[in-house]
Structures are given as C-alpha cells and as structure tokens.
C-alpha cells in the first residue's frame, strides 16, 4: 500500500464531518475522472447523508428503494438522536437491508464500495453504514470465437460499455 496513491488517506478513519469525509473518498477514488463511483447526497431526518456506490457493481434500484427511500420515509424521532448515534439509529430503525454493518475505516469502505456494497455517510457520525447491494453481470470473461488474435489478449466483450467495465472490475 506504500506506493499506492493516497495510501495515507486509506489508513485514516471517518471524521464525522460529511463534507470532509466525502471529499476524502472523492480524492481516493480519483473523481471526477472516475465516473463509475456515485456520490448521492441527500437530507433525511433533519441531517445530511451521502450514499456512495460503484455504478454497475451495486444494484441502483436496491440503493434507491431500501436505502434512500427508507431514510426519507423514516423521520420519526431522528432529529432527537445524538450525532454519533445516527448510524446505529438508522441501522436499527430505517434501513431495510439485513446485511448491513457499521464501518469507520476508509480502507475497508473503499474495498467494499469497489466490491459492490453501498456506504452511507452521515453528517456528525464517525461511522458509516456499509450495506449489501451487490448486483452485476455474472458471466465470465471469455475468449472470442469469431476473431482469432495471434498476439495479445483474446478476451471478448459484446455487452454495453458499463457491463464490460463491470465484468473487468470483477475479473481484476
């Protein structure tokens, strides 16, 4: 990890300042050049949140239905919760995904986001919710039959660009 760009940022933990934490993740992921990482900021329960996931690796409908809508629909008593307890409060009372846990380390958040999970960062909270939202193309990258290549790679892609990128992410 020493020769990786932003390795020092990966060793850090969430600060609880939503703007600073999202900017750190944007730097680690190389935004705006890396357009596959989605940052979806929104307000719910009287505080600010941001969902972060990899397009093509996470099911966007699952993110919308079980995370964004669930947080918007559940405002009852959320403003009375202490900032540090917001993640646990949402985990127990709002999020409808059973495979969810709290995480505070950037390295683990980045690893899981790239693997298809969604991180929910919450303003004032040093823990993020990490939720199972994986869903991607399931075929293996295969050799082409119709095009024989003498030198070089022989893997073939016939789907959309987004699907092909997702297949390569899983392959690597």
Region spans (language model):
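Membrane-embedded alpha-helical signal segments
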Residues: 1-172
């Amino acid at each position: 990890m020493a020769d990786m760009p932003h390795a020092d940022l990966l060793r850090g933990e969430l600060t609880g300042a939503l703007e600073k934490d999202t900017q750190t993740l944007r730097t680690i992921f190389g935004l705006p050049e890396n357009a596959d990482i989605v940052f979806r900021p929104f307000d719910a329960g009287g505080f600010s949140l941001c969902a972060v996931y990899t397009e093509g690796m996470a099911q966007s409908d699952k993110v919308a239905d079980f995370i964004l809508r669930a947080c918007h629909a559940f405002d009852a008593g959320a403003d009375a919760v202490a900032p540090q307890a917001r993640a646990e409060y949402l985990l127990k009372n709002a999020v409808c995904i059973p495979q969810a846990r709290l995480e505070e380390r950037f390295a683990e958040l980045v690893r899981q986001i790239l693997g298809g999970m969604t991180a929910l960062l919450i303003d004032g909270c040093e823990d993020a919710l990490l939720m199972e939202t994986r869903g991607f193309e399931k075929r293996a990258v295969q050799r082409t039959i119709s095009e024989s290549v003498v030198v070089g790679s022989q893997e073939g892609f016939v789907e959309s660009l987004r699907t092909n990128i997702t297949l390569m992410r899983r392959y690597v």
